[in-house]
């Protein structure tokens, strides 16, 4: 039986994410591995230069969904502890937007649980990303509006 610490760390924050402290938080003497995912702001998206990002969330529901993810990975993988922290607000290029760390006695469980956590977070947690470019902004996974027919024929 794997001993779990009293509490996983599941947070939405508006300041820089301290990834080193989260790695220390999940580490236990019974663990043999920590697997982490560090998602950060890149300087381009779909061939366009990104200036910055803004994240918004439906916070009560987002935290509830993060708790569901943590509960699932505790139930289905042999892990010790998980930290899932997502940043909200304005983020510059290179800043961490989401950090997940999973500790476990063995690396396989930690890898699988971390992968499940980020993939499920992206699909189910109500957090939205708006990308800002020199020529405008778009919500992530959204499409740019189609070019009007008159603009196409003018070119």
Predicted regions and their residues:
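N-terminal, polar/charged subdomain of small-to-medium soluble alpha/beta proteins
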Residues: 1-96, 105-115, 119-155
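Short hydrophobic/aromatic beta-strand micro-patches
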Residues: 101-103
